[in-house]
Each structure stands twice: as C-alpha cells, then as structure tokens.
C-alpha cells in the first residue's frame, strides 16, 4: 500500500458498533475522496482484485482492473459523489468485516441535475487492511 497506508483501526481492535461505524465512515470518505479526485492508485488500494460491482443501470463489473478502467473512462472529471448525511448504516459481519448501507448523490459539474442512489458495500478486513469486496449500487434516479 506504500504511500496509502490505512489509519483506520483493524477489525481485531474495534470493540463496539460505534467504533465500527466510525471506521467504516472513514473508509467511505477515503474511497470517495479518491473517486472524486480521480486518484486511481489510491482507489485501487481500497478494493480487492476480484471485486464484484453490481449496478442497476450498467450491470455487473468483475475485477479491480475493469472497475478502475470504468472509473477512468466514465467518472473522472464528470461526476462527484456525496454521501447523504444521516443515511449511513453500518453492521458487523463476524470474522469478515462490515456491511455499509446508505444513500449517495452524484453531481455533474456544470449541470444542475443531481442523481441519487442507494448502495450496499461489503468491507473485508484481511491481512491488516480494509478493502471493498462487493458493491450493489441501485435505485438510481433524480434526487428525491
């Protein structure tokens, strides 16, 4: 991970659901700061090689490289993501990590239209690092 070492507590040191929620909130911020700034290298450190990304509009993407390529081609400079305040839910997955559920908004620079969608993200803690293993992004539409 080099320059992108994680500062989020490991699953083995988290003692409460509140601590887990703080950790996953920090991970979500790291992930989408990289997404919003097109930091593909950082983004790549936060997802597993066999990532599965399910999207209601574009279908299934399997693998880190196809996912990062899609971000480069379709997202960089075209879309920014914002977590809807108060929407985040985090639940422990024993011996694995956590499930993150929430609502996010997507802004297109120079366009007043704002999209909104729901998401479920599985975070795995393995070998001293948190990484996204599965994502379901669904119910995309205009902001409600």
Regions found by a protein language model. Name each.
Residues 83-86, 101, 113-120:
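Short, surface-exposed coil-to-beta transition loops
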Residues 6, 116-141:
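Short beta-strand edge/turn micro-motifs at domain boundaries
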Residues 106-108, 123:
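Beta-strand elements of well-folded, non-transmembrane domains
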Residues 2-49, 144:
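Short, low-complexity N-terminal intrinsically disordered segments enriched in polar/charged residues
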Residues 18, 22, 40-96, 103-105:
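A solvent-exposed, acidic/Ser-Thr-rich amphipathic alpha-helical stretch
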Residues 90-98, 124-129:
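A short, structured loop/turn motif at beta-sheet edges
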């Amino acid at each position: 991970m080099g320059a992108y070492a994680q500062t989020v507590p490991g699953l083995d040191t988290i003692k409460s659901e509140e601590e887990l929620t703080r950790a996953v909130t920090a991970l979500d911020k790291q992930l989408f700061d990289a997404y919003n700034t097109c930091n593909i290298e950082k983004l790549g450190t936060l997802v597993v090689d066999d990532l599965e990304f399910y999207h209601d509009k574009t279908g299934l993407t399997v693998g880190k490289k196809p996912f990062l390529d899609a971000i480069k081609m379709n997202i960089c400079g075209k879309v920014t993501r914002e977590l809807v305040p108060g929407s985040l839910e985090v639940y422990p997955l024993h011996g694995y990590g956590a499930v993150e559920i929430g609502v996010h908004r997507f802004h297109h620079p120079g366009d007043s239209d704002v999209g909104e969608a729901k998401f479920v993200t599985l975070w795995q803690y393995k070998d001293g690092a948190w990484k996204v293993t599965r994502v379901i992004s669904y119910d995309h539409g205009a902001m409600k």
